[in-house]
Amino acid sequence: MKIDETTYYSVLGLPTTANKKDIHKSYLRLARKLHPDKSKSNDFEELFKVVVQAHSILTDISSKQEYDAILKRKGLSNYTPLGYKEHTKKQNQSNNLNQQDASKNSKKNDGVPTQSKVTRKNKPYEQQPYGFGLDFNEGSKMKKDKQKGRNTSKNSKEQQGSQETTNTSENLQRNAKGNKNNKNPRKDRFHTLDNSLDTENDNKRRNIKKAKDRTSKDQNTYSHTNYQRKRNKVKFTQGSIRMRNPEATQSNPDLQNDWDPLKDIISQFGNSNIQDDFGIENIKPSSDPRTFELEDLSLDCEYDFVESNSRVRRANMQNVFINEMDRLMINDPLDMSSIKHSLYSIPYTKRQKTSQSTYTFNDQNYRFTERLPRQENSEGPFGEIPSVFESSTGTMENHRSDFNLRGRPETRENDNIIIPEMMHFPDAVTSKEEEVSLKTRFNHFNEDCNRTKEYILKVLKNRISVDKDLSDMMTVPEYHSLILATKSFDVHLSKQLLELNELQFNAGQRYTELFKSIQY
């Protein structure tokens, strides 16, 4: 047995596009052939080790990705083994043959109904024949059973007349058979009894139907309606159904006794002398609710509030006209002291007081103070005024001094950032000593520039952290000028960083040109 060991995929007999399921299937197929328990040859044992290694690498996701990258570099990403190509060709040929056979069979069977083409007709169960609605199947030949046991409610009226004729014809046929074959008289006697019973039942049904028809004709007569009224007299007297010509109902004394207490309650509502629990008199309504006098529209204005037993009583109402309103209105100004006293008298729970916390960051060249947002205290019943509405006098000066420690963009006197000067380069390098000195000076220049760049980046990082901590404070209108100053300082720092990068680029370019022109 030979195995293509070009790639791990070809060891398993698969292309590089195989998925995990195909890898596992091919591994099991080869393991059944090459496992040491199945074959004792040493060659198969070595091949099985190669198959196990290929399976372990291709089933692991990380190792499979690394191996695929190696195959791409080697140009083997689209490699397919020879055995896989032959297998696919055979499979395609077999599929084509199966398709051709299926097409031939379909041509031969044209016009012959198959089971897949047959559909059942949608009918109710009672109307469904014994053949289950199939066109090519014949129904049962027991027409007698169909007529007796399969009669539907829709066709019952139409088939009643036909049943009578069929019963009589069946009786004649059975009697004729009985005369010919007298071997079993019990059987003949049994048939005659059954037929007589059927005819009797049919006659009874016909008589019942005729009686019903006779009553339906007499329903419109006066005697019939009078009978129905007397029959349902109890229902009409109870009031559930109204009659066309009802009789006069007699009064019931029990019902009158039930209405007496309700009449007393209604009569008490009309009495104007009754007062409620709050001392308010009830006004007697007028006879006609739609008519009223102009004097009744006057204002009830005299309000005398008296505190007694935690209730408010209103004095007797009097009619007050509009010209008397000035005399009765209250001219005293509103006193807020009573409202304040009532508010402070409300019980409340005090919260624990918290102090303002600060955090300082110290450095040799940089310092700032982070002021955390102030937590609210509750000295009074409603706490202190929120910090957003307080006047921030003095705090702006403190924060401005914190920003001044970093250096102001207007003047460069307070800046601690010192940009190194451009190093001097000779016109040409003529000796070994000049070359060594040029290298040392260039290294020192790069170290100074990098040190300054580190400091600038550190300042920018701290500036970002301060902006995050003081973002709420910067939205206050008093700090708008401070926002502009800090942002201009950020621009100044970025310009210095750009200047340093340009110096280093120019120095490096000049340094490489000198070393290219060395001639000694």
Curated annotation (Swiss-Prot):
PROSITE patterns: DNAJ_1, DNAJ_2. The keyword ATP-binding does not apply. InterPro entries: Apopto_cytoskel_mod, DnaJ_domain, DnaJ_domain_CS, J_dom_sf. Residues 152-182 have a biased composition (Polar residues). It comes from the Eukaryota. Residues 91-100 have a biased composition (Low complexity). The keyword Chaperone applies. This is J protein JJJ2. It comes from Vanderwaltozyma polyspora (strain ATCC 22028 / DSM 70294 / BCRC 21397 / CBS 2163 / NBRC 10782 / NRRL Y-8283 / UCD 57-17).
